[in-house]
């Protein structure tokens, strides 16, 4: 048993090192790809050595903020998805499928129409919309007994309804073209203000998730077992819900509703390292950042020299996976 645990620990360490190398290479690749070709080595060098060149200005003012937004948004959505799947014990749970992203998007778009644009007001409205979307889904799914498939279907119905309301606002708004592009999930055009906006929420949210990862693992044991272990289940669920709202709301506010990151990444992580959330959450953050960084690179390559929203790439990757899980969901109890 000791040797088995030691092997698992060594396997996780090796996997973390490999993932970290892939992540660092992805950062360099993300900084180097664009209209101006810059080598990966030079891209990483310009982060530490200032020479005032045009290439360095491109990286420092355009590509580095965009890359950091990809890291923060990818990590935040992946951790939010892992927390939702743990709290609901539903493998189909994610911020997009449960109406959280759609609610946040609706409130943000409505605020942009009514109020002057402000990054922090957008975050506040995103939090409120995420909470409203999640609450509506929970109320619908819990009536008459909640099941994983019922929860997923309720989430998709609310997601479609809220998304249609958002589309209606965009159509009726004269300046809706820019908002429509944001709705596809886009991080191109990100700036340092966006980084400053999301960074504290992402760091605090992921930090809290890691601190309470042990309690998250207990949720998977069922309410009776968790109560027997002295856990306050209602308190844990409220705390996890707040963390999910922080991570999802901040991500939507700066990047739009990017889908499938929160669904795809936790499944991959659990397949690789097991069900213990002390490991699932930090690996989800790392894998989520990797997914969105590389998806952003693909978004620049698909229609080069034009750029596609990164949300389109994650949808192409995630849709077949969601259909696979939904098909398996017929057998979920």
UniProtKB/Swiss-Prot annotation:
State any GO BP term from the record: siderophore-dependent iron import into cell
**Source organism of the structure:** Bacillus subtilis (strain 168)
One GO cellular component this record assigns the protein to is:
plasma membrane
What keywords are assigned to this protein? Answer: Cell membrane, Ion transport, Iron, Iron transport, Membrane, Transmembrane, Transmembrane helix, Transport
Please describe what this protein does: Part of the ABC transporter complex YfmCDEF involved in citrate-dependent Fe(3+) import. Involved in the translocation of the substrate across the membrane.
Q: Show the stretches that span the lipid bilayer.
A: 13-33, 67-87, 97-117, 121-141, 151-171, 201-221, 238-258, 279-299, 302-322
Q: Which PANTHER family match?
A: FE(3+) DICITRATE TRANSPORT SYSTEM PERMEASE PROTEIN FECC-RELATED, FERRIC ENTEROBACTIN TRANSPORT SYSTEM PERMEASE PROTEIN
What Pfam families would the database entry show? FecCD (PF01032)
Annotated membrane topology? Multi-pass membrane protein
Q: Tell me where it mainly resides.
A: membrane
Q: Which domain of life is it from?
A: Bacteria
Listed name of the protein: Fe(3+)-citrate import system permease protein YfmD
What one GO molecular function would you report for this record? transmembrane transporter activity
